UniProtKB/Swiss-Prot annotation:
Species, as recorded: Cryptococcus neoformans var. neoformans serotype D (strain JEC21 / ATCC MYA-565)
Molecular function terms from GO: ATP binding; polynucleotide 5'-hydroxyl-kinase activity
Protein purpose: Polynucleotide 5'-kinase involved in rRNA processing.
UniProt cross-references to Pfam families, sorted A to Z: CLP1_P (PF16575)
Enzyme class: transferase
Annotated compartments: Nucleus, Nucleolus
Domain of life of the source: Eukaryota
Protein name from the UniProt record: Polynucleotide 5'-hydroxyl-kinase GRC3
Protein family according to the UniProt entry: Belongs to the Clp1 family. NOL9/GRC3 subfamily.
One GO location term (cellular component): nucleolus
Biased composition, class Acidic residues, residue ranges: 100-111
Region named Disordered: 1-131
Gene3D superfamilies attached to this UniProt entry: P-loop containing nucleotide triphosphate hydrolases
Amino acid sequence: MSALAARRATAAAASPKPEQPESSIEEVSVSGALTLPSPKRRKTRQTSPKPRSKARYSDDVPTSRQFFQATESLAEQRTGRFSPSAPDSDGGTSSSSVGDSDEDMAQEDEFEDRREVDGERDQRKVSVAANMSSSGPFKSLDLMPVDITSQFNPKDNVNFCRITEGQLASAEMNDGHPGPGVIVSLARNESLTIAGLFLLTPLQNTLSIYSTALSPSMSSFPVYAPTSHPLPVISPASTQAPGKGTLSILNNIKLPLSFQKESDKTLLLIRENRCGIDGLRNGAVPGFSNIWLEDNGPWGLRGVHPVVGSFPVPVYPYCTPPSWSHAISSLSSSDVNLQTPFVGLVKGPKRSGKSTFARALLNNLLRRFRKVAWLECDLGQGEFGSGAVVGLWILDKPALGPPFTHPLLPSRSHYLGTYTPLTCPDEYLVAIRHLIEHYKYELQYTSEYSALHTTVHDKISTHVPLVINTQGWMKGLGEELLNVIESMAQPTRVFSFESQSEEVYSGQGWTSTPPWQATQLPYDPAYPTTEPVETEVTQTYSLETAPVSALQARYTPADLRVLSAITYFHASLHPTQSVPVTWDISSPLVCTIPWEVELGIGKALEKVYLIGEGSEGVLEEDLPIALNGAIVALAEMLGSYEDEPTVYEQGRSPPPTDLVNILGLAVIRSLSSGNSVNPGLKLQLLTPLPPSYLSRARILIKSGALELPLPGMIDWRRGGINEEGMLGKGWEEIPFLDVGGLDVIGGERRRFRKNIMRKGM
């Protein structure tokens, strides 16, 4: 042994070994307790160490799953996996390599990410206090403490009671929704999370769901809770509405003597919601077949799945941040009255919860007002209509669910034919300006006398408040458009979401741009052309972003647009919101019976307008090719407009916005040319519009930027598609689809060799 080695051995023996502390809960993070990897070392042929007998992250280091086993012993409650590619165990991973190469580092990062998703997968009560990674769409966002499972333990005839359809009928619960139900009694500190489709009826005291307070009422509220979105948490409201304690129907239902129905308990009735949207489980939209779970629920109700204890699929709950609660509670103040019409504008970046808060704002305004107006400025993700449309909607009932679950007919709307105002900023502002003027002069003040409606929940009916949902484009041109919209709307309250902080590089040679500030020029009475700017006091609320979850990355905005488009064309809309929306997704669009409408001068549809880039290049003889299989907007004319008496003219601009009202969208499934006796075109239309609205349509507007998604063109039923084709036709006979591959260099299937770097090769 050399002298240097002897000195090292002596020093190692003399130095005391530090005691290994026992692993505690505080020392283990939720995302997984992994030791830091050792720095990379250069591998050489002679000095490479021997392969390690166990992995870098060995079993003596507690993992995230071991942490939860030590706290709540939830490993036995796990009944579902996040994906088929998830690992079966989180134990140590052995490797025959050195462990310091780039390949090993990538594998270890992959297992670390899987452990992070496992932490989101477990159905347990866990307070998440760690920050998300700065990479990806979640940059520097603090996760809120959330409870994934319900704080409710159902006990038969104590806080949970099954009610038959006959008992509901004898109690005069005749609202057109057949089927049995259950009555749940919630204490002050209890909550109930439910996935699926159900009807909610508050029976005693006010409850809270989706940041919305619901008081006892004879009305039943349809709730849509797919697992692709945050699940609603039902809990007693923090403040109870005076004079609305118990519903009279509760006295007509015979409940067991042991059932808890004291005055401090919150009682609610849950029934089946047979609307048809659960037909998505048949495979109409790929990736969304399992968002409604199974048909039979554990409570014996169809499509109702309470999240109590363990749950077979990964879910995450809907949470209300404190700043949201403060902003919503301010709506009950005395300034929201007849003297000050409420105009609220919600703005914020993408994925901040802007549309979710705006929907909660709308629902809470409906507690005081008979009707509330909604101005949609987001072309990409419309709340009550399909994309590429800006419009005004008038609502008298709350919307409890994601946007694709409550499509409604607009009061006034305009079709731009694109998902972004980048290509048409001028037309975008003109359409919104007209909608704001239409609201101020036609909808804001009603002719109804408020005394006629004071007996119905004491709601205000003399004027209609407005909620403006803006787009998430907050930089460059998007910021300029947002400022113009705010100046046109003149909101009384602005709800602004905090922008995500960006990492600014401050190295050598880089400087940060100073913030831009606007200053109003002083008023000079010497110049009569200059008018003083009258500024009203606008209350501004700063809101924190919605809590994020790793499960949100499963679906992109493009996926949600496809889901919204397919469900829109499978829906059946009604002129009034009192009749709920229904869906028929039992068969694909290619098998749906269409409307046959004639297109021509003096026919049902008289004119066609093409908008968007490249529309001016479509010749008149190519019009059938441009319309066949396209998504078009059906519009009505509200006044006379001097135009050429032809069906289509190349390069013709559409009528002014004040003369056109978009009724809805339609798909031209096919068309056929007329003959000499009956010239024109016969169109086969698929549209969710009712016949009364379809008969008002006079013109078609088509944009080349909006196309029908692929799931709307195929037969997605089991056995509907094979290698030869679908519907008994070969692929070469199927319109609008090209299944054959491209004959290009490198387009063939790649083959991988497995004998590279073998010995003797």
